[in-house]
């Protein structure tokens, strides 16, 4: 049997091979080996969140590595460092009071009670974002500040943002946490000017420990609001207060966002969240079904997950639809019933939800450009403009992410899609011919 330090070193190498750098830093570097005795391994972790994550996601590797090194199963045990403190032990004996305080603080911070780390399903598309969120929640204002999540609609950016707020309030019940959408920030700023309460507005936003701002891209063209947010950002950052932002695209791809803000957003960590793969979609549905106490066979969940691949909101909406269909018809939930329930949804989707390929085909026919050229690399104007219009329409008329759109045009980078979108926007403002052509193509796509 190896000693605990050499066994831990082997484990570190095993995890380093399968985890991203932020995940490795979040889970492995924060863990301390205590004892290895009689095939039992004791590890000290910094929080209950870390313990839960280890138990759910990382324990199997301990058993696997132990078997390789010793020929026997090594069983892990986790000790939370803070639970050694008598003060915390006393708090754990009185959970009801703590829950009330937590609930009141969460409501005051405008946090959604459903959006916690416990309800978040981890997959390949969000693993790094989840790890970074946990790091920030456990140690705000230090490593990743600001933390910037970006990705398409309904992929979990807001969920992670709220989860950070909840966890910080669990760790620091007296912390001042504020969640706000960019629209609300703008409206409150304008109102403070009209009512001459600007100083009160600044105190509210600059005297917080954690500021969560959703959909920051909508501030891009609001000059006065951006100026106010710039100073708010600086004040909080200089005081080592944590800032978390979300957007549908990376900071440097947000049109008309001032360079001074782009550079500040880059001071921390920017993480993209991509659509969930099939396994993650099934796990999301299982978690939702368990929360709703629904009895659904695995093959039925797999069927539903196979029908919806766009985002988590639509996926959960499909499950609600199946549940309602079963209740109305007084039937058990089966794959056959799910197919009937989602039939009309797919029918509506086929009419109203365009694919990138449909847009490409329509543009190809309209301009008499071969589809392979539209997706290819030819740079002649008769092909470049239709290609840019295709990218523009894909951005405007679908929920696909920038990388996804780029991939459908011969593997182009997402910055190419951004450039195409901006180029066509500019042409639409001054070129009547382009206005007419884009309008006609839109009508064809909507007909």
Curated annotation (Swiss-Prot):
Region (Domain II): 74-109
Location within or outside the cell: Cytoplasm
Residues binding ATP, per UniProt: 154, 156-158
Stretches assigned to coiled coil: none
SMART domains associated with the record: AAA, Bac_DnaA_C
Cellular component annotations (GO), alphabetically ordered: cytoplasm; plasma membrane
Full protein name: Chromosomal replication initiator protein DnaA
Source species of the chain: Enterococcus faecalis (strain ATCC 700802 / V583)
Encoding gene per record: dnaA
């Amino acid at each position: 049997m190896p000693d605990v330090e050499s066994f831990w070193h082997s484990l570190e190498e095993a995890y380093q091979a399968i985890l991203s750098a932020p995940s490795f830093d979040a889970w492995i570097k924060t863990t301390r080996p205590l004892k290895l005795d009689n095939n039992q391994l004791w590890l000290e972790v910094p929080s209950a969140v870390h313990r839960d994550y280890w138990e759910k996601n990382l324990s199997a590797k301990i058993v696997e590595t132990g078997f390789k090194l010793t020929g026997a199963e090594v069983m892990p045990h986790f000790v939370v460092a803070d639970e050694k403190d008598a003060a915390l032990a006393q708090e754990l004996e009185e959970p009801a009071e703590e829950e009330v305080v937590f609930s009141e603080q969460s409501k005051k911070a405008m946090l959604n009670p459903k959006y916690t780390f416990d309800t978040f399903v981890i997959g390949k598309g969000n693993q790094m974002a989840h790890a970074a969120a946990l790091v920030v929640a456990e140690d705000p204002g230090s490593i990743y500040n600001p933390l910037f999540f970006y990705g398409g609609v309904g992929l979990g950016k807001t969920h992670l943002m709220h989860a950070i707020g909840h966890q910080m309030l669990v760790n620091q019940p007296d912390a001042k946490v504020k969640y706000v959408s960019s629209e609300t920030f703008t409206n409150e700023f304008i109102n403070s000017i009209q009512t001459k309460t600007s100083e009160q507005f600044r105190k509210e936003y600059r005297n917080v420990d954690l500021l969560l701002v959703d959909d920051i891209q909508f501030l891009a063209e609001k000059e006065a609001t951006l100026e106010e947010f710039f100073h708010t950002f600086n004040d909080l950052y200089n005081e080592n207060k944590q800032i978390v932002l979300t957007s549908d695209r990376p900071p440097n791809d947000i049109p008309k966002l001032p360079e001074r803000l782009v550079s500040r957003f880059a001071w921390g960590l920017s993480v993209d969240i991509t659509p969930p793969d099939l396994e993650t979609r099934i796990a999301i549905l299982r978690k939702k079904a368990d929360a709703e106490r629904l009895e659904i066979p695995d093959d039925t969940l797999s069927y539903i997950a196979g029908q919806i691949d766009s985002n988590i909101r639509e996926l959960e909406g499909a499950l609600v639809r199946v549940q309602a269909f079963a209740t109305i018809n007084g039937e058990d939930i089966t794959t056959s019933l799910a197919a009937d329930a989602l039939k009309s949804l797919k029918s509506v989707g086929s009419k109203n939800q365009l694919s990138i390929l449909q847009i490409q085909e329509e543009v190809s026919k309209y301009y008499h450009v071969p589809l392979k050229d539209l997706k290819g690399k030819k740079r002649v104007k008769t092909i470049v403009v239709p290609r840019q219009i295709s990218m523009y329409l894909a951005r405007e008329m679908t929920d696909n992410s920038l990388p996804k759109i780029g991939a459908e045009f011969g593997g182009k980078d997402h910055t190419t899609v951004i450039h195409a979108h901006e180029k066509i926007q500019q042409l639409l403002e001054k070129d009547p011919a382009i206005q007419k052509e884009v309008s006609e193509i839109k009508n064809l796509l909507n007909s």
